[in-house]
Amino acid sequence: MSRLVVVSNRIAIPDGSKSAGGLAVGILDALKNTSGLWFGWNGEISEISGEEEDDLNLMEDDGITYASVPLNQNDYDLYYCQFSNAVLWPALHYRIDLVDFQREAWDGYCRVNDMLAKRLQPLIKADDILWIHDYHLLPF
């Protein structure tokens, strides 16, 4: 059976502090059944950009590999707050009146997607099934 690789904006790293919700509930069994990989942002704002060699955090839990990277404040603001939330979310929910497009945010959105794709590439196997989740990763 092929391994499922889920790529999402943010991953639910198991730490025992709270129960999984949202996307995690729907995919944990599928990831477990395929010895899957869940890749994305770890939710941390860091001084490093996610592009450093040593900032990829890999851990295994209950048959699932979790691979995550941090974002720096600038990338978080541009990619997540200003483009994903202020452009894509309103546009994809029929609220064009709320869209606030700024070229710098688009550049940040593309830069973070490119960085994530480059960080994921060495972790991918030829027969993996990729699931790219949600609008945060459209250029992926």
What kind of region is each of these model predictions?
Residues 40-43, 91, 133:
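Intrinsic disorder/low-complexity segments enriched in polar/charged and small flexible residues
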Residues 130-140:
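An aromatic- and histidine-rich active-site surface loop
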